């Protein structure tokens, strides 16, 4: 059938379930993709990379023999990845200190690019500051694999947001109040996206998730 298909909620699988939720937001209180400003700090909540590891284990691109809580690596990572973090209360208060945010579904780099394109800015990401799950150390994952999963893995459903440097203390205080881990991982700037590790350009060969 020659019908154009538009939208990001597409899959190669035989079954597709779409759920739509609608609501209202007070004027000026929306966290948008197009509000990042030069010199804003870049933050993420929680940790990154564990869902991506589950995918790699599922496809057998990575093999790990270590068990956690009596579970093989794939079962453990998959089950833990299905527990989606609830950041709603934190996000409701975050609007007082940030105008720009989205959730990380297709990978940090891919979703950050959505912000950069809509806001017409560039960014610097410091790889050594990315928050990694403790399982990476337990499984003794190679550092390059850890970095790749954090940058491109996807499925984290953590918040990626920007905010003026003057708001850092308030943001960290808010994070403490709601027991949410928040990490500052970079800076909004003019130009393009730069990914650095200890000040040196990080080699980029990978892509975030693409629906097709």
Predicted regions and their residues:
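Glycine-/charge-enriched secondary-structure boundary and capping motifs
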Residues: 1-6, 11-15, 22, 27-28, ...
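Short, flexible, glycine/charge-rich loop motifs used to bind or transfer phosphoryl groups or to couple energy/partner
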Residues: 32, 90-91, 148-150
């Amino acid at each position: 059938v020659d019908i154009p298909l538009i939208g990001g909620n597409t899959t190669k699988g035989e079954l597709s379930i779409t759920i739509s939720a609608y609501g209202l937001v007070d004027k000026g209180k929306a966290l948008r993709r197009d509000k990042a400003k030069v010199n804003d700090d870049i933050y993420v909540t929680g940790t990154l990379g564990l869902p991506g590891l589950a995918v790699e284990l599922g496809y057998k691109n990575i093999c790990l023999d270590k068990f956690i809580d009596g579970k093989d690596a794939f079962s453990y990572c998959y089950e833990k990845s299905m527990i989606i973090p609830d950041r709603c209360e934190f996000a409701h208060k975050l609007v007082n200190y940030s105008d720009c945010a989205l959730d990380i579904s297709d990978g940090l780099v891919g979703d950050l690019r959505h912000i950069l394109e809509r806001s017409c800015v560039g960014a610097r990401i410091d790889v050594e500051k990315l928050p990694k799950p403790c399982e990476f150390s337990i499984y003794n994952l190679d550092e390059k694999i850890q970095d790749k999963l954090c940058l491109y893995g996807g499925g984290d459903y953590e918040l990626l947001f920007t905010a003026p440097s003057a708001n850092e203390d308030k943001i960290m205080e808010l994070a403490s109040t709601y027991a949410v881990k928040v990490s500052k991982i970079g800076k909004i700037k003019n130009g393009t996206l730069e990914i650095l590790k200890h000040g040196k350009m990080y080699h980029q060969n990978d892509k975030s998730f693409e629906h097709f």
